[in-house]
Amino acid sequence: MGTGTRAAVDSAFTCETFCNLLKSGLDVKTAASAVNCAMLMKSTDESLATVDLFIADPINSTIEVYKCGAAPSFILRGGKASVLEAESAPMGILDKVDMARSEIHVSKGDIYLTVSDGITGESWGWISAELKTYRAENPTDLAKHILRCACDRMLGKRADDMTVIALMVE
């Protein structure tokens, strides 16, 4: 969320700190609260970052998705796309962080697609339409296709970061 050096610094700080806290053994809620507090305290200027966290459990064939101000994600299963969307503020805005959590059962061949708000722009309906019609051989091809479509929609007016991540369940 945001552009330029400041947004890059806030994003890197959030990602690195969150990952380190999770690796040290903190649960997601506690780590999110700590990162949010750090974001609030680190600057007198507005400092914020969106979070889109994905935790896979291969034993139970589930994924947990946590979102904090992030753009929608999508599950592509058997040619049908489901949308994972959550209403929550980015980290660094409110005193209390409220990460939306979803748990999804996944099967072999399912593709999980997550994008930044620079990809969705003002709406994400076009992504659902693309997922219904585009037949990707692999997740990399799908991610590249969505990125190309987003660039075409922006008509050269790139205003935000444009990130697409696609993962396939094997």
Language-model segments: residues:
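Terminal helices and disordered tails flanking the catalytic cores of nucleotide-processing hydrolases
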Residues: I146-R148, A166-E170
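Conserved, helical-rich catalytic subdomain that frames metal- and/or nucleotide-binding sites
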Residues: S88-P90, D98-A100, H105-V106
